[in-house]
């Protein structure tokens, strides 16, 4: 068997906000003299007055009462009747995410935004500025806590995999290392389910085969693992179990192959009158992104998640490439009506792919050129206003007149898109 690589010339940090949504709301409330949500039974998500929706995030005291992320608020309240419920605030999340990433970016020019609440930092070559990596990690952690009022974990290693595994060790407000020489003591005793990117289906197959720890996986024969869970997945997880990962920290994203927008809801979406404004807001977002990048799409797809967490999607090819919001919206509406059976929804998304340059357009005999030009001028006007005054400063009337809360979420999503 191959020995674990030790790429001593790399130094990678993974910075992860502890219970991000709950922490961000707590930081704001504490500035207002209110109790810290992290110290009391509390959750983010749902309508406090109606006691509806789902639990998006929970405090440790709420967790001790048996409250679980993703369960209905009504069920959580039966377990924890005195729990404080706070509705989601997407504007706040965007603001806090931007603030913590700004601090992280001040330590290295090579930062990869992995999600709204976590980043990778490539600290390779910073030894003159930060000769002690652990001290540098503590400095980042303490600055975020002191300046922003919430805590993070920082994982340190020689690659992204091990750095992220390290940041998931004891929480909150901790710095952990997981260097290759520490793998046998720190990582191999962990349950196999703790390995990054190992899903429930693979876990079930591995445990049934007697592979219960990450160490068991690392010391098995790779061909046996591939037989159990497939060649590609088996190879990757076998490498991960041995601490091998050569993926770079990407300061710039790969060439875009498509654009997408998704919205998760705390309450059930149950009517087409609620769905249409959501689809329009998302089509507005992806079309504006295409126009900024001077691209057009040739394919549109919609996706949605039901109350039992089942995902469904539907896709179609367009007769002509487009970047016009209204054309994408009409297509998305049709796709949704063809695939939705009326079951309650918790997530809706729109994506566009098959991108082409916007300097070529094939005309159709069946298109109304005047209507097309009118739509194009409307999009151009909205783009110009948003560029001058901010992405969140103008919203289509159909969105504002639609489902409650959709406009606010769409504006927050567009603001975040413009500033990243």
Predicted feature residues:
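C-terminal hydrophobic structural anchor segments
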Residues: 322-323, 327-387
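Short, charged/polar surface micro-motifs in flexible loops or helix N-caps
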Residues: 18-20, 48-51, 307-310, 355-358
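Short small-residue beta-strand/loop micro-motif enriched in glycine and branched aliphatics
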Residues: 85, 310-314, 359-361
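Short, hydrophobic beta-strand segments
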Residues: 119-125, 313-316, 362-368
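A glycine-rich phosphate-binding loop feature that marks nucleotide/adenosyl-phosphate handling sites
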Residues: 158-161, 241-242, 296-307, 345-356, ...
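DNA-contacting surface of Y-family translesion DNA polymerases
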Residues: 5-7, 194, 202-345, 417-419
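Gly/Gly-Pro- and Ser/Thr-rich, intrinsically disordered tail segments characteristic of DNA damage-repair
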Residues: 1-236, 242, 288, 372-420
């Amino acid at each position: 068997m191959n020995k674990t690589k030790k790429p001593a010339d790399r130094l990678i940090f993974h910075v992860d906000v502890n219970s991000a949504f709950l922490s961000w709301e707590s930081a704001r409330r504490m500035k207002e003299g209110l109790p810290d949500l992290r110290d009391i039974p509390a959750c983010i998500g749902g309508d406090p007055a109606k006691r509806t929706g789902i639990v998006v995030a929970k405090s440790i005291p709420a967790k001790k009462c048996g409250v679980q992320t993703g369960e209905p608020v009504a069920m959580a309240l039966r377990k924890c009747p005195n729990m404080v419920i706070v509705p989601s605030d997407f504007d706040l999340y965007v603001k806090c995410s931007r603030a913590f990433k700004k601090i992280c970016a001040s330590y290295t020019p090579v930062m990869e935004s992995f999600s709204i609440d976590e980043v990778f930092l490539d600290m390779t070559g910073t030894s003159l500025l930060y000769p002690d990596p652990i001290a540098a990690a503590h400095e980042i952690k303490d600055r975020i806590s002191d300046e922003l009022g919430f805590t993070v974990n920082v994982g340190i290693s020689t690659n992204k995999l091990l750095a992220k595994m390290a940041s998931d060790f004891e929480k909150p407000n901790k710095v952990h290392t997981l260097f290759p020489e520490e793998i046998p003591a720190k990582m191999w005793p962990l349950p196999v389910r703790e390995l990054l990117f190992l899903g429930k289906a693979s876990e079930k197959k591995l445990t049934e085969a007697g592979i219960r720890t990450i160490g068991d996986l690392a010391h098995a024969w790779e061909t046996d693992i591939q037989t159990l869970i497939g060649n590609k997945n088996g190879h990757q997880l076998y490498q991960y179990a041995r601490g091998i990962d050569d993926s770079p920290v990407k300061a710039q994203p790969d060439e875009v192959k498509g654009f997408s927008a998704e919205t998760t809801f705390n309450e059930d979406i149950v009517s087409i009158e609620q769905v249409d404004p959501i689809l329009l807001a998302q089509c507005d977002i992806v079309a504006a992104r295409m126009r900024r990048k001077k691209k057009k799409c040739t394919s549109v797809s919609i996706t949605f998640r039901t109350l039992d967490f089942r995902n469904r999607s539907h896709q179609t090819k367009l007769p002509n490439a487009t970047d016009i919001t209204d054309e994408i919206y009409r297509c998305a509406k049709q796709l949704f009506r063809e695939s939705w059976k009326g079951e309650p929804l918790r997530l809706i998304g729109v994506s566009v792919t098959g991108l082409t340059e916007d300097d070529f357009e094939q005309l159709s005999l069946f298109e109304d050129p005047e209507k097309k030009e009118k739509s194009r001028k409307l999009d151009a006007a909205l783009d110009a206003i948003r560029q001058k005054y901010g992405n969140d400063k103008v919203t289509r009337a159909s969105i504002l007149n639609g489902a409650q809360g959709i406009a606010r979420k769409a504006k927050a999503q567009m603001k975040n898109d413009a500033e990243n």
